[in-house]
C-alpha cells in the first residue's frame, strides 16, 4: 500500500489504537498526515479512550528531540488540546549526535538514561503530558 498510495496500510493505524493493558491505561500514539487527526479524534471520543495524541515524525510516538509537536489529550473520550505545535527545529540539543545509525543512537540513549547527558526538553515535555494523564486515571 505504501508504494502505491504513499501511506502505510490501515493495519498500522489499527495497531496504534491497541491497548495491551487489562486495566486503565493511557494509549500514547501519533499521526503524521493531518487528515488522521480528525479520524483519531473521532475514534478516541467515540470509544471513550484515554490517550495522548501527538503529531509525530513519520507517525512515530516518541517525539523528535528537536521539535515540540501538537499534543491532544483524551480522558475517557473527552478532548483537551494540551499544547500547540511550536514552530521550527532546535538548532542544537545538548549531546544529541548527528549520526543516526543504530549503535550511535543506542549509546546516546544509554548515556541519557544513565544521567550522563540531559533528557532533551521535547522528550521531557512528552513524558510530563503522559504522567499528567496517567495520574487522572489511577
Where are these regions (language model features)?
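Glycine-rich anion-binding loops and their surrounding alpha/beta cores
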Residues: 1-138
Amino acid at each position: 500500500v505504501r508504494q502505491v498510495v504513499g501511506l502505510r496500510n490501515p493495519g498500522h493505524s489499527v495497531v496504534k489504537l491497541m491497548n495491551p493493558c487489562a486495566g486503565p491505561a493511557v494509549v500514547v500514539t501519533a499521526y503524521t498526515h493531518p487528515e488522521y487527526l480528525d479520524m483519531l479524534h473521532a475514534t478516541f471520543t467515540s470509544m471513550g479512550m484515554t490517550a495522548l495524541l501527538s503529531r509525530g515524525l513519520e507517525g512515530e510516538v516518541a517525539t523528535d528531540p528537536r521539535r515540540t509537536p501538537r499534543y491532544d489529550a483524551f480522558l475517557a473520550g473527552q478532548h483537551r488540546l494540551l499544547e500547540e505545535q511550536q514552530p521550527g527545529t532546535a538548532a542544537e540539543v545538548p549531546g544529541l549526535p548527528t549520526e543516526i545509525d543504530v549503535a550511535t543512537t543506542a549509546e546516546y540513549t544509554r548515556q541519557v538514561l544513565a544521567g550522563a547527558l540531559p533528557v532533551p526538553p521535547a522528550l521531557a515535555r512528552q513524558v510530563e503530558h503522559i504522567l499528567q494523564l496517567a495520574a487522572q486515571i489511577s
